[in-house]
C-alpha cells in the first residue's frame, strides 16, 4: 500500500535539515509522540554529504494477541535512514521486531524529501508498506499507515518548534 505524507515547516531548508539530523531527535520524539514509549539512536555514520542513522523505536501499546508474530507482544522496530545533504533526500526502511519466520511478510520503505518553498520547507514522505497476511493484510496496512502518519505528525511539530527558536 502506497502512502504519502506532507508537512510544511515554516523555516529555511538548512534549518529544517539540521533539526531532522540533530543527535537526540529520536529521544525527543519518544517524549512527545503519544504512540512512542522509547526511541534511541543505535548507530550514526557521516561520510561526505551522507548521514546514515539507525534508530530503535518501541510503541507504548502492547499487542498480546499478536505475540505469535511480534517478539514479546511489544511492537518495536528499527528505522534505517540514509540522508544526502546535497540533494536533501533520504531513503528509509523500517524493520519491525518480528519473529524470524514472519520478517519476510513485512516490507516498509520509502523516501523523505525536503524542498524549499516560498512559505518554508515542504517535507514529503512517500513509502510503500506491504504486510503479507491472508485476508487481514490490507486492513493491517491501513492501520499501520495511520500510526506512521501520527508519528510523522509528532515529528513535524518537534521540527516546527526546533526551527522557531
Predicted ranges, named:
Residues 42-46, 107, 151-155:
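Alpha-helix boundary/capping detector
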Residues 1-65:
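Hydrophobic ligand-binding cavity/cleft-lining segments
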Residues 9-11, 85-87, 116-118:
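A generic beta-sheet turn/junction motif
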Residues 84-86, 137-165:
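A conserved amphipathic terminal alpha-helix motif
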Residues 51-53, 77-82, 91-146:
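Beta-strand/loop substructures that line and gate deep hydrophobic ligand-binding cavities in soluble
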Residues 1, 73-75, 106:
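Residue-level preference for beta-strand/loop junctions
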Residues 31-33, 97, 141, 164:
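Sparse recognition of residues in long alpha-helices and their boundaries
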Residues 40-96:
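Glycine-rich portal/gate segments that line the openings of hydrophobic small-molecule binding cavities
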